[in-house]
Amino acid sequence: MAAHLKKRVYEEFTRVVQQQPLEEPSAKKLRLTKPSKSAALHIDLCKATSPADALQYLLQFARKPVEAESVEGVVRILLEHYYKENDTSVRLKIASLLGLLSKTAGFCPDSIVDDVINTLQNEKSHQVLAQLLDTLLEIGLKLLDIVSHRMRLVDVACKHLSDTSHGVRNKCLQLLGCLGSVEASPAKEVENAVAKDVQKIIGDYFIDQDPRVRTAAIKAMLQLHERGLKLQQAMYNQACKLLTDDYEQVRSAAVELSWVLSQLYSESIVPIPSSNEEIRLVDDAFGKVCHMVSDGSWVVRVQACKLLGSMLQVSPHFLEQTLDKKLMSDLRRKRTAHERAKELYSSGEFSSGRKWGDDAPKEELDTGAVNLIDSGACGAFVHGLEDEMYEVRIAAVESLCLLARSSAPFAEKCLDFLVDMFNDEIEEVRLQSIHTMRKISDNITLREDQLDTVLAVLEDKSRDIREALHELLCCTNVSTKECIQLALVELLKNLSKYPTDRESIWKCLKFLGSRHPTLVLSLVPELLSTHPFFDTPEPDMDDPAYIAVLVLIFNAAKCCPTMPALFSDHTFRHYTYLRDSLSHLVPALNLPSVRWSWIPDVITEAPPEDPSQQFLQLSLERVHNLQHLGSQGTQELLEFTIRDLQRIGELQSDLAGMADFSATYLRCHLLLTKALNEKLWNLAAPLFLKNSLTTNAVKQILEETYKMEFMYSGLETRQVAIIHHMRLQAKALQLLVTARTTKGAEPLFGMCEEFLQEVDFFQRCFISELPHMQDSFVDKLLDLVPRLVNSKPLEMVKILQTTLRQCTFLRLTLPEQIHRASSHIIEPAEESDNPIRFTSGLVVALDVDATLEHVQEPQSTVKVQVVYPDGQVQIIHPKPADFRNPGPGRHRLITQVYLSHTAWTEPCQIEVRLLLAYSSSRSKVMSRASNSTWGESTETVPSTESSTEGTIPFSKPVKVFLMPKPARR
């Protein structure tokens, strides 16, 4: 029995239990809620015990942003308090807030239109009404596509046009101008009726008693025109009447309306008042606008002068009247005293008074019936150019330029007036006059008296004025050889008085000679001081005046093959010297006495194709096909290719950017290849540390990549990716050098983490370029990223070293054109041996004049560096106003650098050069991308990033003697 029980105890029983699946408890969702803006505003307004408190709460609320989903609730709260509020100022602020809220991005105000319109019904305050209408205008501008809302707002505006307040009427007219229908054939009849009457409704307020309403009506009509509605010709007479309004705002708006109608109906015929004649509407409007040049308000005069320049359809007869100097009095020219005396004497009339014929009957004229064309257009530009306000004179000069460019006869007639403006007392007017004459120089030829007046401006102390005049003379035609001689004499005087104008004067004489070769031909013996029988002394080639004369003659000789026969022997020698030193000023001439073998750019038969471009491409292809970059022969081939590319850049200016960019890229590869040489890495750590080849290579590669990125313009996304790929290789090499020369692994943790971030950034930033980088360093690195993340620093260094040696040469593809940023310092000149003396401790101003080529955003990137003999470095950031932009891709820097130092025992040289500042960060790299794929991943870039800043020298240093004198005690 015991055995049986024991067996029962140890017996295992099996039992199948079917359990119902338990329901999973619903996951709790965390919902973040923001405090309700409407509730907070409601509580604040309820706490207000006075209108001043309520106004204060509203002002505080206006400073806080409101989300689009909260706007409607806030509007309801504001409207609720609006109806409860009795104070006008609080209701006015609420109405203003409604307008601000309706402009919230992402909010559609169609749900609050009815509520805002209802607030107008019981409002008695004119100020609040005007503000509510302004709010409706803001709502309507956001609902322009919804015709029903727009037309309802127009009806509201029409309803309140009869208000006694000018502010309400102004807002109604503004609403009509911005929301009135401009469709030619509306779909609905109701809309058609309103659209047909909107011009009439606005036009009825042209005669409103308040000038502010009249101005608003005209501006509303102009707003309709800007929105595409063709204005009716019938309102031209109304616009003409408004030109004589007592208020300048009305006259100013009426002038613009008259001009608009003259452009719409230029060929329409309108009658002349009190006459049976008819003229074109544009001619009539031109005369009326000319009449406004004599308006009492200088604002109206400026606007009238500006509009005259755009009325190009006017008849030549009326256009020429604007330059008529005859003084008009009741349609009669004012005769001189001699002419009046002669007429009186020939008439035979007499009187017993003091004056002969003073009691003779005169024709009575109605001054109100004077022809506006004759009295308006006559002398309009004369009045404008002689106006007391310089703004009017500038506007008149600009309009003269526009009209003269469209009419060659008018350009000839206005020449005397423009030349007279060169003597204006305001520098801005003189400068604008010079620019204007340069623009119309193709249509004019200067006489000797006009040229004399023009050349007098060379005495101006303003550098901008003088250089603008030099540019004018570059494209000016003169009539006689005396004019050429006069221009040369005055330019040489300018050169003597202002030596800093040397480059500008030489350039001016270059174009002056090339435009007038036959006139210069007759002056050659006199200019070169040659004699048919006697030898004359050889002039000094260092004399800038003599160089200026030669530049004039050599450029004229290019178009005059008989001129070289008048040259003396030393002139040919001087030509070869100038052709080599100033090749941009002296052209290539086929002179019989000159050997051409060593002179660049000689006139020869042009090959059918430019071989330089082909040679550049073949050189790059030859390098790309290299397999073993570490061999000695490969490195020598890279060096030869770099040398050839540099030579191409020196000989071919068009290919200089592409050749220099390619040479820099190959130089980086050469440095990287030499730095990875196995013999260097097999050295012991102390010897490796002593041999600084690898460290210098890393530093130089990083510098070259920054130059490639910031000194060259025209780069595409692929070139920028190649630059960053080379920089990534340099940083990997830097990590290897640090691991080789540092004891322990702790300093490497931070560098390894930073390097992995760089790899991640490269992948996200240049993801579209990765397919073009097969078998490159970054391509292999991305495959090894999971392994690198889990590796120790020393293991990661070994992987990087192996990957660097195994990666292939990344092919460099070039865009159509690459330009390299360059600069040339004109002043200070390096040849001066006279030191700049000043008292120690004080400052002296050094004039800096430089030309910049292909520099992007020079106002923020170009700096001036001054290096003193004791090693002190001063970096000056010029003002934005110091930069000028004479042409596309070209800038001019004219500034002053203030120097100061302690006393020296003898004069020493300081170095002045230009620097190009750069700042490279991840966000800026992405923003510079032109490809959309660059900008797609900007959100994933970490906000905390280190920015690399530096400067790149991009001009030759100029040495200037400086001598600080000790202060007298």
Curated annotation (Swiss-Prot):
Main location: nucleus
Keyword flag Acetylation: no
Family matches, as InterPro entries: ARM-like (IPR011989), ARM-type_fold (IPR016024), INTS4_8HBD (IPR056235)
Gene3D superfamilies: Leucine-rich Repeat Variant
UniProt keyword terms in alphabetical order: Cytoplasm, Nucleus, Repeat
UniProt keyword Nucleus, yes or no: yes
GO cellular component, one term: cytoplasm
Compartmental location: Nucleus; Cytoplasm
MF GO annotations: protein-macromolecule adaptor activity
Chain intervals for the UniProt region annotation (Disordered): 928-950
Pfam families reported for this sequence: HEAT_2 (PF13646), INTS4_8HBD (PF24493), INTS4_C (PF25458), PDS5 (PF20168)
Feature: compositional bias, Low complexity: 928-949
A GO biological-process term: RNA polymerase II transcription initiation surveillance
Intervals holding HEAT repeats: 68-107, 147-185, 192-230, 231-265, 279-315, 371-407, 408-446, 448-486
Family: Belongs to the Integrator subunit 4 family.
Function: Component of the integrator complex, a multiprotein complex that terminates RNA polymerase II (Pol II) transcription in the promoter-proximal region of genes.
Subunit architecture: Component of the Integrator complex, composed of core subunits INTS1, INTS2, INTS3, INTS4, INTS5, INTS6, INTS7, INTS8, INTS9/RC74, INTS10, INTS11/CPSF3L, INTS12, INTS13, INTS14 and INTS15. The core complex associates with protein phosphatase 2A subunits PPP2CA and PPP2R1A, to form the Integrator-PP2A (INTAC) complex. INTS4 is part of the RNA endonuclease subcomplex, composed of INTS4, INTS9, INTS11 and inositol hexakisphosphate (InsP6).
Protein name in UniProt: Integrator complex subunit 4
Native source species: Xenopus laevis
Name of the encoding gene: ints4
